[in-house]
Amino acid sequence: MRWLLFLYLIFGVSLISRAQGGSPEISNLPKGPLNQLSGQVFLSPSLRAIQNDPSTNPVSLWLEQGKELWLGQAGQASCAQCHGNIEKMRQAATHFPKWSVKQQKLINLEDQILTCSERTQRPLKGLENTDVLSLSALLHQTSAGLNFQIVPKDETLQRWQLELNEGAKLFTTRIGRMNLACTHCHDLNIGKTMRADVISPGHPTGFPIFKLSWQSMGSVDRRLRACYSGVQAEVPAPGSPELRQLELFLKSRAQGMPIEGPSLRR
């Protein structure tokens, strides 16, 4: 599996890049409120076709690796030994980010995967580690079709609300040399063109994503850091509290929209 992934990263991306075509015409966007549209709606027709075909969608390689990691190898600790069949994890991706009482911080699904890897004495390194993203992709695919259920029903609710409020502030705060906030693109300019792309509402329903400009999979954490860079602001370190707060707000903002599973993006 790993050698297939390696070969794909060398040769496969350029083939998809040739097929990507332009962004969809604004006039072709569905009617109705633009702020409720998935990012998949804003893909070009050629990329949407690749997204919908498992035989050409590069995400399939990460899903296959995720399945192998879940089951593990004989004699080694595995996810399945603790959690059983992957289908039992149908709800898993719907609950993150959440407040961890033990760690006293907001964590997302990739953080939880890293924590679990330490418990099995097979620690993974880094949020964008291929194994971490493969397991994240598998869990998000398993939760596809379900809505986010991120509001806690326990004693963490009060702290969770404080974190959510901070995320909302970050979403509307101008930053960087361009003096822009998230809301200026993803609320006020949805459907307009920027850098050859049509601006989407920025709902995190299709993560982790395979982004052509990255030539790899990436998490919400990575995408948010890219946005900081895009407006020429100081980029937070991976896993920073503000990134988790923003992710929490974005998923709260997407309440009522189904998780789509790992997706392709330009």
Model regions: which residues?
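Surface-exposed interaction/gating patches
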Residues: 67, 140-193
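Short cysteine/histidine-rich metal-coordination sites, predominantly Zn2+-binding motifs
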Residues: 94-103, 198-206
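N-terminal carbohydrate-binding/catalytic regions of secreted carbohydrate-active enzymes
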Residues: 63, 69-71
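Intrinsically disordered, low-complexity segments enriched in Gly and acidic/Ser/Thr residues
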Residues: 187, 193-211
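Acidic helix-start/capping segments at beta-turn-to-alpha-helix junctions
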Residues: 79-89, 96, 154-158
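Post-cleavage N-terminal segment of exported redox proteins
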Residues: 3-8, 13-62, 98-165, 212-235, ...
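The canonical Cys-X-X-Cys-His
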Residues: 74-86, 135, 167, 177-189, ...
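Short Cys/His-rich "knuckle" micro-motifs
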Residues: 88-92, 192-196
